[in-house]
A protein has these predicted regions:
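Serine-dependent carboxylesterase/thioesterase catalytic core
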Residues: 37-40, 61-63, 68-69, 78-168
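Short, conserved loop/helix-junction motifs that constitute active-site signature segments
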Residues: 30-31, 121-125, 168-174, 195-197
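Short, surface-exposed "cap/lid" segments of acyl-processing enzymes
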Residues: 29-68
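C-terminal catalytic-base region of ester-bond hydrolases, centering on the histidine
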Residues: 170-228
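Bacterial N-terminal signal peptides
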Residues: 10-20
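Sec/Tat signal peptide C-region and signal peptidase I cleavage site
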Residues: 22-26
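Bacterial N-terminal signal peptides that target proteins for export
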Residues: 2-11
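Acidic-and-aromatic substrate-binding clefts and catalytic sites of carbohydrate-active enzymes
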Residues: 43-47, 74-79
């Protein structure tokens, strides 16, 4: 039987146990994302990605994970621009310490990204590749400027670039591929030039070529795909 002194000590011990705060549960570590390299289209600039970048920041991406690349849209896709993209991807990987990047491209930028992935070593450095309204099998509207512009020639159906990108496997390596295309695209003709064999191909409805850049449903689809 406990003495009055022992009862008092036991009660004090019990009270102290309840008053002592439990150690705080450690917050779950934030999982970093792959750096995302955005590639704009013909006659455009990196500023076109403002809306999608804002959506991605709201979804948890840090500014340090988002990279809008600029390039001369009149140069040769395969001879000049794809190599410049490869150098930029290497720079991003060194800067972030990431093994791989994700690529999100619009229009002409899709051909640049594809050439880098297929012929420039990108199958080892790219995790996800996304094309918004890319002329992946060429577009007849490019004939309007093909006479004086190399990038326009590269976008024409049956061009050296288009033919080689689509020879054999259109989606090579372990890269995850996705395209988003509109049946009202006034730039890419025919509309079904965008989808690729082996990719996740998403129709977005009747949206103009440049409007895909600010379309909420397209943005949500891109973010969901990058998270897959």
């Amino acid at each position: 039987m406990l003495t009055p002194r022992q009862k008092t000590l036991a009660l004090l011990t019990l009270c102290l146990a309840f008053l002592t705060p439990f150690p705080a549960r450690a917050a779950a570590p934030v999982q970093p994302h792959n750096p995302v390299v955005f590639i704009h289209g013909y006659n455009a600039d990196p500023g076109v990605w403002g809306g999608l970048r804002e959506d991605m920041r709201a979804a948890g991406y840090a500014d340090s994970e988002l990279f809008s690349w600029g390039y001369d849209t009149h140069r040769s896709v395969n001879e000049v621009v794809a190599g410049q993209l490869g150098a930029y991807v290497d720079q991003v990987r060194r800067q972030t310490g990431a093994a791989k990047v994700d690529i999100v491209a619009h229009s002409l930028g899709s051909l640049v990204g594809r050439w880098y992935v297929k012929f420039g070593g990108g199958t080892a450095t790219v995790d996800h590749w996304v094309s918004l309204a890319g002329p992946n099998h060429g577009t007849s509207t490019a004939w309007a400027c093909a006479l004086w512009d190399q990038a326009c020639r590269d976008m024409t159906p049956g061009s050296y670039v288009v033919k080689n990108l689509n020879a054999g496997d259109e989606t090579p390596g372990a890269v995850k591929y996705a395209t988003f295309w509109s049946n009202c695209d006034e730039v890419v003709n025919p509309d079904d030039s965008v989808p690729l064999a082996g990719a996740t191909n998403t129709p977005v409805g009747c949206i103009k070529h440049n409007d895909l850049l600010g379309d909420d449903a397209t943005s949500a689809g891109v973010r969901a795909f990058l998270a897959s």
